[in-house]
């Protein structure tokens, strides 16, 4: 199976890029191997939940290096957990390797799941940073101070966020397994925020940023 029909939906909704500047590596057949990258309770809960559901789960937390590059990770999906901001070298490595990835974190007690990135086909984490910098010129400075800093939330909220992330991994797995029947995974170009007091869910849409390197060469400049 492939993601052709899923990508057609993405193009129709404007969440995908026409053409590629970085290579997307298709997930063949089914989503099986997942790497949970990050240190903290959120990653722990999610890794346990995914393993119990039958996925082959690998844990990691270190920075990539020349000896251990991201391109060497044998995985179908990387879930970036816990850290408010992940290492720029890691993000660049995932994009260059064409590895699908999902960000999951706690921020000031709020659980945030997404976006789900298909490199070169959907908006990416750098797109979000560029959008935030457009609104707040100080964001690049703030972001640099948050690299590998774990967010925190109440234990129940953390478990609920892990469960929500697992649900969206299942959505992707179903879209790959049965593209004719499954709906479009909700987190392509979107984040879902789980708030409490009062309990509510907020969805935000992130379009591809015109200055991001993930855009096709023809669309830049």
What are the functions of these language-model segments?
Residues 57-67, 102-109:
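A generic structural motif
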């Amino acid at each position: 199976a492939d993601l052709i029909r899923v990508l057609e939906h993405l193009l129709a909704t404007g969440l995908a890029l026409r053409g590629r500047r970085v290579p997307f590596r298709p997930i063949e057949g089914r989503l099986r191997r997942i790497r949970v990258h990050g240190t903290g309770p959120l990653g722990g809960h999610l890794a346990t939940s995914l393993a119990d559901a039958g996925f082959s789960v690998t844990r990691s937390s270190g920075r990539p290096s020349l000896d251990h590059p991201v391109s060497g990770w044998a995985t179908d999906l990387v879930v970036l957990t816990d850290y408010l901001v992940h290492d720029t070298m890691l993000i660049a490595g995932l994009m260059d390797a064409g590895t699908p990835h999902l960000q999951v974190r706690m921020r000031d007690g709020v659980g945030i799941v997404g976006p789900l990135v298909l490199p070169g086909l959907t908006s990416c984490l750098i797109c979000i940073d560029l959008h935030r910098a457009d609104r707040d010129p100080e964001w690049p400075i703030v972001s640099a101070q948050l690299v590998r800093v774990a967010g925190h939330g109440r234990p129940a909220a953390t478990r609920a966020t892990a469960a929500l992330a697992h649900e969206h991994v299942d959505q992707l797995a179903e879209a790959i397994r049965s593209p004719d029947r499954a709906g479009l995974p909700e987190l392509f170009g979107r984040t879902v925020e789980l708030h409490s007091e009062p309990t509510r869910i907020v969805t935000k849409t992130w379009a591809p940023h015109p200055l991001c390197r993930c855009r096709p060469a023809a669309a830049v400049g």
